[in-house]
Amino acid sequence: IERYKESSVLRIGIDSSINKLFWAKMQKMINDKHSEKDFRFSKLDSYIGSRMLRENTLDIYIGYGLNDLEQPDEIGEKPLISSRIGAYIGHESSINEHPEFKAKDLERYVRYGTKSYLCSVMNGQKNDPQLLTQGIELVDNVDTMKLKVEFNDGYALADSRYFSYYDGDMLLLPGYDGECVIKAFYRKKRNKKKIKEILEELQNVVKS
């Protein structure tokens, strides 16, 4: 019986860069239709989330992408919501001193990013979205990226709506109209019916 109960619990990991606004929507889904016992939520960075999904110790991983060169065939994905890309800057950034600041003006500043957070290595263009390999000071993780931005008067591109930060500011700039997409990654062959139902619920509650 205990083993059955354990197998009926959905294990959902959420990218650690995603803020409380998104988590509140997850709680709403539980409160409206489910019980706390139905889920086991975890806050994970994308490296760990990708590995756990691949190793079948996670049923759904919610984030911007997987840290695999090629997405395994057994892993599916469902877009949940897109948000405009913004420029994350430090609270004391000199960028704040320029009220008419535009995206091209950022060329004077150091840009930071990490491969563990895909929004930070995008070009920011909606019509031609690309991942960049040059012009960015790459660091290991999101926390380090935020510290580098803060202490070096730099910036990083991020999800303007769902990026988690406690210090600093988020700017929406003319010239950056690209979007970050939060997706649900899942194992195709596990609990097919239940996973499909939950994915639909996730999409609906996030867009509500």
Describe each model-derived feature in a short phrase.
Residues I1-G13, K20, E70-E77, N96-E97:
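Short helix-loop hinge/linker segments at domain boundaries
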Residues S7-D68:
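Central regulatory/effector-binding core of bacterial HTH transcription factors
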Residues V9-D15, Y61, Y88, V110-Y112, ...:
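Short, well-ordered beta-strand segments
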Residues L21-W23, A103, E107-Q130:
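Secondary-structure junction motif
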Residues D45-I48, M52-T57, Y117-L171:
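Hydrophobic hinge/microswitch elements
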Residues Q71-K78, S83, T144-K193:
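Beta-alpha-beta core module
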Residues I75-R111, K196:
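Flexible hinge/capping segments at coil-to-helix
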Residues N96, K104, V181, F185-S208:
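Extended ligand-binding regions for polar small-molecule ligands
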